[in-house]
Amino acid sequence: MAAMRPALTPAYRAVIGASDPIMRQWSRMEVTGLEALPATGPVLLAANHDSYWDPIAIGVAAAPTRQIHALAKSSLWKPVIGWVLDGMGQIPVERGRGDASAMDRAIEALREGKCIGIFPEATRSKGLELRARSGFGRLARAVPEATIVCATVTGTVDDARFPKRPYVRVDFFRPADAHVDPDEPPAALPTRLLAEIRARAPHVVPGRRPKPVAPA
C-alpha cells in the first residue's frame, strides 16, 4: 500500500492559502523542480536565505506537495504569531547556542515522516558570504533515511523596481553530493550543499537584481 501524503495542518493551510495570492500579486512567481520533493517520507530541505520573503516563497511553492516544518529563530514567537507558528508546526530555535531541544523536536518530526526545512546559513545573508552551520549535518546523521533536497530562491531581495513586480523563482533539486559521512565534521555536509545552492543562487546585495542562473 502506498504511503499516505501528510496532510497540511489547518493553520498551515490557512497561512499558505492567504500567502499564495499575496506572493503572486507582489511578484511574478515561477516554481521548478517540484518533482524533486518527495510527497511522503522524511525530508531534509536546505535553501538559501536572502530575504524575509524566502520562507513564504518556499512554503507557497512546496504546498502542493509538502508541509514544511521549518526551524526558525525563537524571537518570532510573540503573542498571537507564536500561536500561529505552533499551529503551523514550526520549530523555535534559540540562536547563538546549541539548542538541543529544537534538534530533538526536528529529529522526532523527521522520524514521523515530516519535511524539515533549514537555512544552512541560519540567518539572512544580507549579501554576505556566510559559513554553513552544523545543524543540518547533525539531523542528517540522526535520521540517515531522510531524503535530502535543496531549494534556491531568487528575486525576493529586490523590490527596487516597484511598481514593476520582481521575478521570483523557486527551484527544487536533488544535490549532487548528499552523502552522509559519520566520520566528517557535522558542518561538512551543509557546506557542500550550500556551495551547490549558491552556485545557482549567488549572494545578492539587497536592492540589486542578479541575472537568474539556469537550472543544471
Region spans (language model):
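Catalytic core of membrane glycerolipid acyltransferases/transacylases, capturing the structured
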Residues: 39-97
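Short hydrophobic helices that act as membrane-entry/anchoring signals
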Residues: 5, 9-27, 78, 82, ...
